C-alpha cells in the first residue's frame, strides 16, 4: 500500500496502555479514536498525507470503521471520507454477544464476555458489574479491566487460576430486554455512510455470523446507498484476511 502512495495509520484506542476507558464495541468512542488518528496523521509533515481518507477495519475494527464513517461529517468535517470497508464486521454487538454468550460455557467465552461487560460498565452508569455467578467473579472482573483485551490467553489463564475454568457462565446477562440489551442495541452500526461501502466476510465465520453482514447489506440497499458485498466460502473469521484470500484482491482492485 505504501508503494502505491498510501499513508497508513492504525487506530490507538484510549485505555490500551494509556489513560482513558477502552471503548470496546462502543461506537462513538471507537469512531472518534479512528478519526483522531487520521487527523494526527494529516499533521505529520513528512507523511505528505491529504485529507482524503479511506476507512477500513476487520472484526471490532469493522465496527469502529462504520461508526467513524457515520460520525465523520459532524466530528471531523475536515476529513474527506472517500470509501469505507468493513470486513467480518461486528456491526451488531447485540447479535454478536448473543452468539458468544448463549453458546456453551468455557473459559474463553467468559474472558471474551468480560471484554464487553467491563468497558460497558465503565461507560454507562445504568450498568454495573453485577450478575457474577461465582464468588471470585468480582476479582476476575477487576483484573480483566486492567489487562489488554486483545490477549485472551492472559484472561483465560486468570480464570483457571481463580478456579473459574469455564464449566459455568461467569456473567448472567439478559440480552432480550433491560439495560444490557438496550446499550448493546444502541451501539449497532447502521452502516449508512456518506461514501461507497465495501462489505466482505467468510461464510464460515465462527465469531460473527454471516447473517449480520447480510442484514447490513439489505439495510444499506434499502436506504439507496452504494454497497459492494462479498461472501467467501470456506473462509472463517481470520482466514478471510489471511495471505492469499480473494478478499485482498477484491478490496484493493
Language-model segment annotations:
Residues 87-189:
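Accessory cap/linker subdomain of secreted extracellular hydrolases
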Residues 40-109:
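Primarily recognizes the serine-hydrolase "nucleophile elbow" in alpha/beta-hydrolase
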Residues 193, 198-205:
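Short beta-strand/loop motif that positions the catalytic acidic residue
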Residues 172, 176, 181-184, 214-253:
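C-terminal catalytic histidine-bearing segment of alpha/beta-hydrolase fold enzymes
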Residues 68, 195-197, 209-219:
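Short alpha-helix in the alpha/beta-hydrolase fold that links the catalytic acid
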Amino acid at each position: 500500500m505504501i508503494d502505491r502512495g498510501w499513508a497508513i495509520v492504525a487506530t490507538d484506542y484510549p485505555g490500551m496502555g494509556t489513560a482513558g476507558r477502552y471503548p470496546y464495541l462502543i461506537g462513538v468512542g471507537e469512531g472518534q479514536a479512528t478519526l483522531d488518528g487520521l487527523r494526527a496523521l494529516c499533521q505529520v509533515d513528512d507523511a505528505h498525507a491529504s485529507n482524503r481518507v479511506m476507512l477500513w477495519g476487520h472484526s471490532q475494527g469493522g465496527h469502529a470503521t462504520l461508526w467513524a464513517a457515520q460520525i465523520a461529517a459532524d466530528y471531523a468535517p475536515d476529513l474527506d471520507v472517500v470509501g469505507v470497508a468493513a470486513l467480518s464486521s461486528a456491526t451488531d454487538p447485540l447479535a454478536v454477544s448473543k452468539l458468544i454468550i448463549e453458546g456453551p460455557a468455557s473459559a474463553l467465552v467468559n474472558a471474551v464476555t468480560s471484554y464487553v461487560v467491563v468497558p460497558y460498565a465503565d461507560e454507562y452508569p445504568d450498568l454495573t458489574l453485577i450478575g457474577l455467578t461465582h464468588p471470585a467473579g468480582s476479582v476476575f472482573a477487576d483484573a480483566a479491566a486492567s489487562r489488554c483485551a486483545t490477549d485472551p490467553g492472559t484472561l483465560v489463564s486468570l480464570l483457571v487460576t481463580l478456579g473459574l475454568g469455564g464449566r459455568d457462565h461467569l456473567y448472567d446477562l439478559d440480552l432480550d430486554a433491560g439495560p444490557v440489551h438496550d446499550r448493546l442495541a444502541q451501539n449497532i452500526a447502521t452502516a449508512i455512510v456518506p461514501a461507497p461501502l465495501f462489505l466482505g466476510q467468510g461464510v464460515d465465520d465462527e465469531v460473527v455470523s454471516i447473517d449480520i453482514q447480510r442484514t447490513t447489506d439489505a439495510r444499506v440497499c434499502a436506504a439507496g446507498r452504494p454497497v459492494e458485498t462479498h461472501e467467501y466460502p470456506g473462509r472463517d473469521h481470520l482466514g478471510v484476511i489471511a495471505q492469499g484470500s480473494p478478499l485482498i484482491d477484491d478490496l484493493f482492485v
